Amino acid sequence: MMAKATMAFCFLLMLTTVMLPTEGKTIAGRTDCEQHTDCSAASGPVYCCQDSDCCGGVDYICTNYGQCVRHF
């Protein structure tokens, strides 16, 4: 039982490490979406990754490909 739990933990740790971008200025190397004025939004601030790909706000992060991803 303990071996399965350890294997699962190691797998999740490895997966998390691989999935995280290496560039960035925030915790775990993720880059916060920066506020950007060129994107039009219905309400609230709009954030973009690398001046493109509009995000919905501060609850998003940018991948190292410049895509917005919601973080939980």
Swiss-Prot record:
| The keyword GTP-binding belongs to this UniProt entry's keyword annotation | no
Main localization is secreted
The propeptide segment or segments lie at 22-30
According to the UniProt entry, where is the signal peptide? Answer: 1-21
GO MF entries = toxin activity
Name the UniProt key words of this record, in alphabetical order.
Disulfide bond, Secreted, Signal, Toxin
List the GO cellular component terms: extracellular region
Q: In which compartments does the protein localize?
A: Secreted
What is the tissue localization of expression for this protein?
A: Expressed by the venom duct.
PTM info: Contains 4 disulfide bonds.
- UniProt superkingdom: Eukaryota
Q: Which family does it belong to?
A: Belongs to the teretoxin H (TH) superfamily.
Q: Domain comment, in the record's words?
A: The cysteine framework is XI (C-C-CC-CC-C-C).
**Protein name, entry field:** Teretoxin Tsu11.2
State the organism of origin. Terebra subulata (Chocolate spotted auger)
